[in-house]
Amino acid sequence: MAKLTTEELIEAFKELSLIELSDFVKAFEETFDVTAAAPVAVAGAAPAAGDAGAAEEEKTEFDVVLESAGDKKIQVIKEVRGLTSLGLKEAKDLVDSAPKAVLEGATKEAADKAKEALEGAGATVTVK
């Protein structure tokens, strides 16, 4: 097997959707028995309760979670495919396994547009 350079790996990761990259990270963690949790997360939990409102306003990344597909499952699958780079089978599997994140780390605008599109197709969606 040819050895890939760091640059080649990064280029390959750039082509993955957030869901595919998340699945890769989970598989990597399981295979090598490591965790990708950033040590900064511990420091982020330290602010006092009075700062909770400020932290809420500063949130810049949002997850769009598909809670259920509703009655129009085919339309929801089409919207999932449009929002992600998933193929038909992967999009169907994602919709079938709801509740599941459709987009992770999206901007507020992208998350709102995705929620609107999915709800327009008949899905129940939450933005976290």
From Swiss-Prot:
One GO term under biological process is: translation
**SUPFAM superfamilies to which the protein is assigned, alphabetical:** ClpS-like (SSF54736), Ribosomal protein L7/12, oligomerisation (N-terminal) domain (SSF48300)
The record's section on Pfam families has: Ribosomal_L12 (PF00542), Ribosomal_L12_N (PF16320)
Is Ribonucleoprotein among the key words of this record? yes
Q: Which InterPro entries match?
A: Ribosomal_bL12, Ribosomal_bL12_C, Ribosomal_bL12_C/ClpS-like, Ribosomal_bL12_oligo, Ribosomal_bL12_oligo_N_sf
**Which key words are in the record?**
Ribonucleoprotein, Ribosomal protein
> According to its UniProt record, which protein family does this protein belong to?
Belongs to the bacterial ribosomal protein bL12 family.
Quote the protein name from its UniProt record: Large ribosomal subunit protein bL12
Q: Which gene encodes it?
A: rplL
